[in-house]
Amino acid sequence: MRSRLLAATVTALAATALTTACDDAPEAVQLQPSTQPSTQPSSTRPLTLAPCTDLPDLPTAECGSITVPLDRANPGAGTTTVAFARVPRTDQSQPPLGTIVPNPGGPGTSTIDFSGPLYAQGLAPVLDRRDLLLIDPRGTGRSTPLTCDALADPTLALAGLDERRTAIGECGEQLGDRSAQHSTTAVAAADDDIRAGLGIEELDLFGDSYGTFLMATYAQRHPERTASAVLSGAYSVTERTEGAMGAAALRRAITLVCERTRQCDGPTALADLSALATTLRATPSTVDVELDGATRQVPLDEWQLAGAVGKAFSSAPDPELQVGVATAASAARTGDLTPIRTLVSRYLATEVATAAAGVQAYAVAADWAVSCHDYPEAFPGGGDDREAAYERGLAALDDADFAPFSARAWSTRGSYDSGACLKWPHAPSQGAPFTAGAPMPDVPVLVLSGDLDANTPVEAGKQAAAQFPNAEVVEVRNAGHTPSVSEGGMVRILEFYAAR
């Protein structure tokens, strides 16, 4: 699901040397780098590549770009540029075994600069005979940036729910048709243009978080070009995960962390959080956030608490932080809010820093353009009065399913507000890239879910796997969101590629 900026997408923890697949695996087309970069219109004409002079962590990388239509059904709408970089396989003496194309998620996150070196490092054991193709989705990174003034202020992360939703809606108004032009199907189409231009027969898809949504879309639309897929921190294109499913995963994760660290008791921690949430719902407090030497005071209520606690279990595991949630809730039982204020303050400062990272790393407008256009509505059927329909749906939820928080606080928390797009202009093309049960390629698919992930839980991974006829689901112990960043997860990924 949406994870604003992944702390790391792939890790180099996989130090175990794994042999590559057998020599009689299907060959991909041998690529020959050119001497000059070029930007070419969308077509099957060969693309040219040149050494990337500004990627020191990827010294062999070759860069290029392609110009594609903003709207393929309306040539007069103009064009946009999509950037890519290819890291050639290290062993050029043998036939290639494929091309891995990863996406780190977001939406809105850069692939080339932000996570390219991490993918290259983590996948190194299988990149001797596989190329690595890094593509910045349209609107992000080195591709033509998508921006909107309404979301330019990173301190919007400190704003209340209504102010955030209003700003997101204003961004949609400012983008107009450009929102639909940066949808997941548009991103997948550009990816296939690059594949064709480089003469690659098939792609080995690798998605983290939103990348699993993108790669499922590519596979559905281009089945004959899909060789395999790895989906890490996965979710289905037709289901939402931030509601009761995520709350159940949070309860499980807190219990597991306490059991495994032996530094807290799961049921007690959940009871303490529930008591604190009840208190802050009735009597909000305040918390100070330090930003660039200045102090901002913001409300500390149940909604803010749900955002901070949910985020602690929606990224790569941090045992100190996660045990700290239980410790802070316990202290609050005795009237000491200092630890919980520290937890929330750090969470909010991180949210602001993420929003301030800049379009080269994280394009907030591209994030919301995809999220509001492609993700299913939480409570559809409102017609012209989506907000009223949403409120009716929210009111009908059972708080018990969202413990230790209320249904409202959990369902609208921070970056995972299920009503974030209520003010976004509705587009006729809005909706999931494909429907449940749509035909998918019968290729090997590995789905990894972390047992400590409250963002894209194990159940969401099973739903993602069910989209494909031949998918294996692996629950990775002690892994959080995007298990590819865990040692156990990356080892499974390398084994998957080595077996092909």
Give the ranges of each region predicted by the language model.
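Structural motif
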Residues: 289-308, 313-320, 355-365
